[in-house]
């Protein structure tokens, strides 16, 4: 399905799910049996048998966040090369702002799962017992990766007006090189943190060979029903 359709469906479903979960916490509703569900991870090609309504609450938030990232990637892909002339570029600016906003929202949703929901979730006997979407390091990696994508896209958008300028001196309105360096370093640090946390969530050594980590991360493609557009954005 299209990512936007999934975003809309989850947006409609989450309020009911959260209302039911709140009623369970307040004991205004009692379940005769525990909730059981089978989940196919969006990050690894495995199925997991889970129980408890909190599992579904966490996973629906993660599905929402991943779909937001997928929709952002779809928008960027549809724009193609947007280092264009001033007239043509204006038509792309609004779409780029939407994509950046979606990435920031995805990062915030993942951060909410990591800081507000997972601390109350039962600790796994091993990291392989739960999908990466229910492991704190994996969720934090998704949050930082989405934020890094947003930063990288915003930097590219910032530099688009000057893409056709060659040679010194810089145009009068060009962003400060020192500011750009700080932004790039911060973005790179977010990507590095995401890779390290992602490796930890998969039981890998964060300082293992770079090509092994890159190969493993490349294998974490989203489910085919999202069109494979949830991976790194093209910069």
Kindly give the residue locations of the regions a language model identified.
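Extended alpha-helical scaffold/coiled-coil
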Residues: 1-235
């Amino acid at each position: 399905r299209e990512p936007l359709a999934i975003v809309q469906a989850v947006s409609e479903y989450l309020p009911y799910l959260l209302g039911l979960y709140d009623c369970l916490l307040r004991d205004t509703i009692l379940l005769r049996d525990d909730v059981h569900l089978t989940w196919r991870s969006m990050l690894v090609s495995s199925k997991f048998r889970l129980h408890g309504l909190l599992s579904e609450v966490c996973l629906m938030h993660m599905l929402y966040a991943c779909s937001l990232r997928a929709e952002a990637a779809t928008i960027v892909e549809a724009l193609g090369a947007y280092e264009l002339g001033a007239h043509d570029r204006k038509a792309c600016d609004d779409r780029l702002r939407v994509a950046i906003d979606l990435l920031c929202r995805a990062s915030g949703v993942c951060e909410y799962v990591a800081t507000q929901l997972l601390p109350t979730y039962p600790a796994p006997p091993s990291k392989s017992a739960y999908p990466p979407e229910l492991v704190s390091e994996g969720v934090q990696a998704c949050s930082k990766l989405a934020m890094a994508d947003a930063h990288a896209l915003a930097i590219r958008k910032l530099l688009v007006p000057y893409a056709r300028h060659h040679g010194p001196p810089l145009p009068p309105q060009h962003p400060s090189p020192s500011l750009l360096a700080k932004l790039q370093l911060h973005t790179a640090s977010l990507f590095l943190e995401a890779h390290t946390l992602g490796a930890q969530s998969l039981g890998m050594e964060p300082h293992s060979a770079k090509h092994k980590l890159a190969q493993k991360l490349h294998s974490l493609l989203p489910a085919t029903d999202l069109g494979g557009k949830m991976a790194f954005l093209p910069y």
